[in-house]
Amino acid sequence: MTRGTNLVGPFLQHDAGLDYYGRRLATCSSDKTIKIFEIEGETHRLIETLKGHEGAVWCVAWAHPKFGTILASSSYDGKVLIWREQHQNATSPVAGSTWTKVFDFSLHTASVNMVSWAPHESGCLLACASSDGHVSVLEFRDNSWTHQIFHAHGMGVNSISWAPAASPGSLISSNPGPGQQRRFVTGGSDNLLKIWDYNPESKTYNLSQTLEGHSDWVRDVAWSPSILSKSYIASASQDKTVRIWTSDASNPGQWTSQQLEFDTVLWRVSWSPSGNILAVSGGDNKVSLWKENLKGQWEKVKDIEE
């Protein structure tokens, strides 16, 4: 995923995301549109332009294919839109498929900066982070959407990322934990990270932990998909640092952080699918890759110039 680095014509492209199979690429930009490309080998072909937002589109996110071909988008206009690809009848004279806007959520009173789908094991859940200070969680069940919305960060929420559905250590423990967890982390303009846990009895998301350390806005957060013995959260900040927060399965409420320093404001952090390599991108259009060594220190393994 990239954010705020490429120009498509005269408009700044804010985000890009590949679908689960790597066959479709969605991009979004300041021109209020979302573009869908088909990827074939080294080539890509524009197949659809989606129009529906009334402001710059900041974020696009594909749902897991078990829920269908579904894309979520969020914008400066305060809206979250859900798009679905409908395949034409095989006997139809019009071949191919069409994209339709199936839901239009106007829950927020300011820009929605990021949307993030939960691990598919938890259900069809979308978490949304807004400059109005609130987080909303949308859930699709039985052909209808329900939502929850709650206050998260006083000065606005910039980013959001779900924890893996299985708790750390559950794969290698003889006594696995209580099944699927619904948990995510948010990053705010109050310089804080906050971890939220779902309570199935009250059916609410409750603040379980606040992580302090950054001295400026937290621009992005990313929870590692790894479910071995530790949990990792990476955070990128306006303070020119990335922090990697670690919690051991033996002491799950305890988080320690390691700071990585950079020469530029940082925009984005992203884990590899296995959760052991971290990509960091910032204002200098460079991407660096980081890995933990055997001593538990994070080392840069590669620089990629865009």
Swiss-Prot record:
InterPro entries: G-protein_beta_WD-40_rep (IPR020472), Sec13/Seh1_fam (IPR037363), WD40/YVTN_repeat-like_dom_sf (IPR015943), WD40_repeat_dom_sf (IPR036322), WD40_rpt (IPR001680). It is found in: Cytoplasmic vesicle, COPII-coated vesicle membrane; Endoplasmic reticulum membrane; Nucleus, Nuclear pore complex. It is a peripheral membrane protein. Pfam families: WD40. Keywords: Cytoplasmic vesicle, Endoplasmic reticulum, ER-Golgi transport, Membrane, mRNA transport, Nuclear pore complex, Nucleus, Protein transport, Repeat, Translocation, Transport, WD repeat. One of its GO terms (biological process) is positive regulation of TORC1 signaling. GO terms for cellular component: COPII vesicle coat; endoplasmic reticulum membrane; GATOR2 complex; nuclear pore outer ring. WD repeats lie at residues 2-47, 52-93, 107-148, 152-206, 213-255, 261-300. GO terms for molecular function: structural molecule activity. PANTHER family: NUCLEAR PORE COMPLEX PROTEIN SEC13 / SEH1 FAMILY MEMBER (PTHR11024), PROTEIN SEC13 HOMOLOG (PTHR11024:SF2). Component of the coat protein complex II (COPII) which promotes the formation of transport vesicles from the endoplasmic reticulum (ER). The coat has two main functions, the physical deformation of the endoplasmic reticulum membrane into vesicles and the selection of cargo molecules. It also functions as a component of the nuclear pore complex (NPC). NPC components, collectively referred to as nucleoporins (NUPs), can play the role of both NPC structural components and of docking or interaction partners for transiently associated nuclear transport factors. Belongs to the WD repeat SEC13 family. This is Protein transport protein sec13. It comes from Aspergillus fumigatus (strain ATCC MYA-4609 / CBS 101355 / FGSC A1100 / Af293) (Neosartorya fumigata). The gene is sec13.
